[in-house]
């Protein structure tokens, strides 16, 4: 029965492993890029702006409209074909083709074309900003999983150490080298270590859930990250920390979150010109071709109406003309639109300055945080070395029976805490360095 249960457990574990999906950092970035809803919205915005930019060039061409009408006329009415008054009822039918070409409109068309192209650049910058943010969020979430994995490993290693020492202590107690009461302290420590493993596993599960939600994956899907090579931590320690002013100037000149305001200001300026052009005269070339039919039209002597096709052909007319429109009063709408355009420019300038100020503050803080993280990691390395030496010494004394179980378990806890602190300092330093890489447009991979 036990053998059967063991086989069932092994089969279940094998199935779970087979169903597990292994993902790399780059695969996570690709998944987030493909699945993120905000990015899909941004891509749709870019496509919308691109179509608007392409169609705006058609404004340079003349338009063409076809029209047709059919009327029943009663009472005293002018026949549109003969232009004679008729007192009887009759029916008329007409066709028109009209084309209008803009000759002058104060630059409205040319500025509209320029504006749609600029709006496309704004949409592109917005999408790039969203893409960079999503990629950075994936890096942060991936690092959180890596950190939780290492914390769980430390907790498991601590259990192994405590279990090993418990077995040794039992042998020493049986030999009379240490009192049996020392075993209780170590057993209590083992229970605490088991609780730490449960808590670490729960934190790991949470970080995996956060990562899956970011990647728009099913929360129940079983994934496992692969650990990238982060052995170049010493490079961060030894490399000079970039100057805050240099990093800030680069970010302000190149990051999409700032550059989008440059294009937005261009768009706002063109919008102001378009609003101002509404106060200028417009000149248009108009051409029209039309024809009419009336069932009340008769040729001399003959009492029957001309055939439909004959009238349509004979009544064909062509008109070419020029139309000039001079705006005099438009209920203040032109003035209001110009004022709103000015306010839009001011608002964009303020948003741009706020973004620049925020960027400088964030970069300065990020540089300070990186310096502090490097110092913390170096201190954590020294702390672990000292804790390891203290643990080795306490273990030797405990095995000789000259140290209490309390002293020994305390040394274990201090060493485990030092290991945890070093891991935390390592990932904090990597994270802080990646923030600087983000501002400098360097690769966010490891």
Where would I find each of the regions flagged by the language model?
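Sec-dependent N-terminal signal peptides
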Residues: 4-13
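Short segments within alpha-helical structural elements
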Residues: 44, 195-217, 384-442
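Positively charged n-region of N-terminal signal peptides that target proteins for export
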Residues: 1-4, 20
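Sec/SRP-type N-terminal targeting helices
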Residues: 40-44, 57, 89, 103-131, ...
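Periplasmic alpha-helical coiled-coil/stalk elements that build and connect Gram-negative outer-membrane
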Residues: 133-250, 369, 373, 415
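Bacterial Sec-pathway N-terminal export signals of envelope proteins
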Residues: 19-67, 75, 219, 226-266, ...
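Small/polar, glycine/serine/threonine/aspartate-rich low-complexity segments that form flexible
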Residues: 67-101, 229-239, 273, 286-326
């Amino acid at each position: 029965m036990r053998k059967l249960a063991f086989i069932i457990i092994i089969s279940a574990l094998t199935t779970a492993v087979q169903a597990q999906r292994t993902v790399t950092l780059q695969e996570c970035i690709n998944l987030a890029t493909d699945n993120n809803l905000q990015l899909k919205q941004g891509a749709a915005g870019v496509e919308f702006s691109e179509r608007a930019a392409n169609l705006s060039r058609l404004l340079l061409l003349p338009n063409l409209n076809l029209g047709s009408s059919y009327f029943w006329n009663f009472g005293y009415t002018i026949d549109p074909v003969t232009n004679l008054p008729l007192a009887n009822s009759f029916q008329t039918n007409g066709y028109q083709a009209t084309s209008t070409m803009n000759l002058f409109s104060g630059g409205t068309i040319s500025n509209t074309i320029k504006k749609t192209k600029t709006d496309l650049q704004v949409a592109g910058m917005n999408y790039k900003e969203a893409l960079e943010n999503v990629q950075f969020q994936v890096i942060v979430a991936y690092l959180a999983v890596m950190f939780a994995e290492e914390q769980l490993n430390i907790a498991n290693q601590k259990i192994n150490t405590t279990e090993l020492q418990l077995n040794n202590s039992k042998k020493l107690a049986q030999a009379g080298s240490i009192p049996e009461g020392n075993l209780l302290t170590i057993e209590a420590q083992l229970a605490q270590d088991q609780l730490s493993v449960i808590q670490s596993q729960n934190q790991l599960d949470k970080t995996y859930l956060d990562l899956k939600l970011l990647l728009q994956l099913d929360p129940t899907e079983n994934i496992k990250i692969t650990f990238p090579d982060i052995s170049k931590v010493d490079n961060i320690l030894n490399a000079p920390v970039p100057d805050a002013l240099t990093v800030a100037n680069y970010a302000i000149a190149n990051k999409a979150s700032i550059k989008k305001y440059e294009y937005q200001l261009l768009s706002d300026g063109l919008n102001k010109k378009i609003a101002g052009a509404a106060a200028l005269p417009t000149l248009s070339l108009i051409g029209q071709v039309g024809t009419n039919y009336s069932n009340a039209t008769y040729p001399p002597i003959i009492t029957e109406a001309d055939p439909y096709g004959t009238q349509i052909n004979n009544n064909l007319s062509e008109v070419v003309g020029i139309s000039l429109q001079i705006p005099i009063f438009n209920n203040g709408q032109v003035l209001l639109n110009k004022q709103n355009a000015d306010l839009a420019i001011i608002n964009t300038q303020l948003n741009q300055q706020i973004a620049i100020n925020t960027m400088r503050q964030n970069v300065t803080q990020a540089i300070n945080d990186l310096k502090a993280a490097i110092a913390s990691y170096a201190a954590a390395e020294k702390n672990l070395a000292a804790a390891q030496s203290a643990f080795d010494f306490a273990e030797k004394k405990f095995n000789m029976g000259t140290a209490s179980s309390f002293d020994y378990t305390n040394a274990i806890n201090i060493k485990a805490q030092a290991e945890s602190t070093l891991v935390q300092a390592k990932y904090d330093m990597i994270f802080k360095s990646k923030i600087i890489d983000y501002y400098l447009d360097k690769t966010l991979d490891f």
